[in-house]
């Protein structure tokens, strides 16, 4: 009997979170509404899988990249507090709204969140939230190897959570074997090897706004596609100049959020995008039998 491999449309959402002037800095509700609008738009255009950038809710901690002296520490601590207060828990009100949007659109959603730990007050994770097409929380992946400046905020993910390797799970779904990694995890050989051994077919590559998107970040995602013979939906943010708060912390790196989202086939070819210097949703029809 000849096996039929899934064919469907994927979407990479290239957008920026909603940022505020001090003292608020973040607006998780406005960013959540923006995400739900994008999910519904992608669903109307036929997408079955929608991928967002790293820590889209409530935004990437750009301010941690430029901390130079303890003279800035007071503002930094306030930023940390606002970041925590605007970060979702799983499950929670934010996951309910994303789930409702996913159900309405009839698609899977993979979105980066700054996850707040409901059990340990003040603990945060750089996480991927996986949502199913019926609005259900499939699970989360908490970043295992924190990238340099993110150590100011994020706790390492635990590979023993729930059951061994549940934190780096490959989901066996009707659209294929789905998983994802965050940013610098694409540099970790053993993490990629785990996905390969588990038979990953469709990969969500979540990246922040960094200038190296045009070189290292793109190449590392392509390398995974070739190694695993999988598709990848790479999502990176774009923050327009007019969207940058006028009264904000001086050590910001918003200028690095230039986009770079794309879709990559199992041979490492870029088949959609990359999109730079604009918000938008990239689409491509993938064929897991390729």
What is each of the regions a protein language model found here?
Residues 1-49:
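N-terminal active-site segment of His-dependent metallophosphoesterases
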Residues 3, 231-290:
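C-terminal beta-strand edge segments of enzyme domains
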Residues 11, 129-131, 262, 282:
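Conserved hydrophobic/aromatic positions in well-ordered beta-strands
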Residues 16, 56, 114-115, 187, ...:
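Catalytic metal-binding/acid-base residues of hydrolase active sites
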Residues 39-68, 102, 109-110, 185, ...:
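Active-site beta-strand/loop signature of hydrolases that rely on acidic residues for catalysis
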Residues 58, 65, 129, 140-147, ...:
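Short beta->alpha transition motifs characteristic of CBS
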Residues 63-87:
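A charged helix-plus-loop insertion that forms the helical arch/lid used to bind
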Residues 89-90, 94-100, 104-107, 115-202, ...:
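Active-site catalytic loop in hydrolytic enzyme cores
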